[in-house]
Amino acid sequence: MAQHDQLHRYLFENYAVRGELVTVSETWKQILENHDYPMPVKTLLGELLVATSLLTATLKFAGDITVQLQGDGPMTLAVINGNNRQQMRGVARVQGDVPADADLKTLVGNGYLVITITPEEGERYQGVVGLEGDTLAACLEDYFMRSEQLPTRLFIRTGEAQGQPAAGGMLLQVLPAQDAQTDDFNHLATLTETIKADELFTLPANDVLWRLYHEEEVTVYDPQAVEFKCTCSRERCADALRTLPDEEVAQILEEDGEVDMHCDYCGTHYVFDAMDIAGIRKNASPADPQVH
């Protein structure tokens, strides 16, 4: 079996092209765990997860990337957020019936792809592109050509391995400020396109790379672990409560006896009673109870 949920970066010695290979099956399972999405939505979230992991690995600084799809289709939102430590989380919102064979256009309808890059230090950048491609990979390749002017190819696979959800993918990209020959890039893309889903899901990364590129000279760097990680906390919820008008919070307490805040990403509930709210209003630290 492959070492799942790892990202491998690699470099071609004879071409100005770099690559990435990632498997994210366990992380995908955890993202889906607290939700009952229709199968096409699950699949698209898996594709988004693979893509976000690959894109996050292109960052040259500490920060995070959010990749989201928005539209007027039955899936109004799908979003994956990841940081340079390959800590990922994601969620989708569905309104209306989703056909069992729904593709990207059917799910999103008239919509667009938004990529937000947020460095820990420096200015936030946001790029928006229409969904002109038939697949998520095609839309992202279009984004790179428009915004970065870097020829980029993504190869995304989702499915099952041993009865469990499995997802992985690969990225090829011309190195910035390098003049890679189009024929060279297309040659490597043609090789990479032959990757089979079951190979990606079940073989060690080095075996996959050897099968694809055994006639090329490739340097493979140490892998980086990929994991599901939610950034929600009781303190963040308390900060959000501080921004609400006193009357609104008082009304919730009067009607429900407590304020129950739910994280869409991980399913955790943070419950605040009247004493907690009073403490928050005085800037005191709320107590610890939370419910998964």
From Swiss-Prot:
Name of the protein described by the UniProt record: 33 kDa chaperonin
Annotated function: Redox regulated molecular chaperone. Protects both thermally unfolding and oxidatively damaged proteins from irreversible aggregation. Plays an important role in the bacterial defense system toward oxidative stress.
Gene name linked to the record: hslO
Cellular compartments annotated: Cytoplasm
InterPro entries hit by this protein: Heat_shock_Hsp33 (IPR000397), Heat_shock_Hsp33_C (IPR016154), Heat_shock_Hsp33_N (IPR016153), Hsp33_helix_hairpin_bin_dom_sf (IPR023212)
Source organism: Cronobacter sakazakii (strain ATCC BAA-894)
Domain of life: Bacteria
Keywords assigned: Chaperone, Cytoplasm, Disulfide bond, Redox-active center, Zinc
Molecular-function GO terms, alphabetical: protein folding chaperone; unfolded protein binding
Matches recorded under Pfam families: HSP33
Disulphide bonds in the chain: 230-232, 263-266
Post-translational modification note: Under oxidizing conditions two disulfide bonds are formed involving the reactive cysteines. Under reducing conditions zinc is bound to the reactive cysteines and the protein is inactive.
Family, per entry: Belongs to the HSP33 family.
Gene Ontology CC, one term: cytoplasm
